[in-house]
Curated annotation (Swiss-Prot):
This is Der GTPase-activating protein YihI. The gene is yihI. The keyword Transferase does not apply. Pfam families: YihI. HAMAP family: GAP_YihI.
Amino acid sequence: MKQPNKAPRANIAAPKGTATPKRRRKTRDELDAEARDRKRQKKHSGNRSGARTNVEGSNKKGHSQTQEKDPRVGSKVPVPLVIESQVKAKSMPKPVENNVVKPRLTPEEELAKLENDERLDALLDRLDNDEVLNKEDQAYVDLTLDRIDALMEQLGIELGDDEDDVEREEKQEDILQLLKRGNPKDTF
C-alpha cells in the first residue's frame, strides 16, 4: 500500500514561477565520510606532539637574534664540571664587629642578681598566694630557681632550712633510743 506523494509546497516568499531547489538526501556513506572528516579535524585541534617539552620549536616567531630564556630553568649561575686547582676566592670585606662582649659575671654576682630579681619575687609572691601561673611564668620561675640552686652548690652555700630537719631527726633518734633502752636516765 503505497501512499500517494504529497504535492510540493510552494514557497510563499518566492514568486510563483520559481520553484525552490529540492534538497537531495545524503546517503549513509556520505554522512559517514563527513563524520570522519569532522572527527579528524577535531582530533587535530590541540597542540602538536612534543609541544610541551620542545619550547624552542613553539616559540619560533622570527626572533632569531634575541633568544628567550626558558622559564623552567632554575639557577643562572654556571656550575663548573671540572675542579680547577686555581679557585678564585672572592674577598669579601669582613664586617666590623659592633657587638661588645658582655663581661661574664662571677657566680657571686650572678647569684646576687638572681636573688634581687623583681620579676622572680613577684612570681614567688603569687605562688605563695596560691595563684596559678601560666606556662611561660612557671618556666621562668623553674629555670631561675634551678640556676640559683646550681650557683649555691657551686659556691658551697647551704640553705638554712636544713637546721630544722636536723633537729627533728635528732629528736626522733632520741625517742627511738629511749624506747630501746627503756629508761631515759640510763646513759653511759
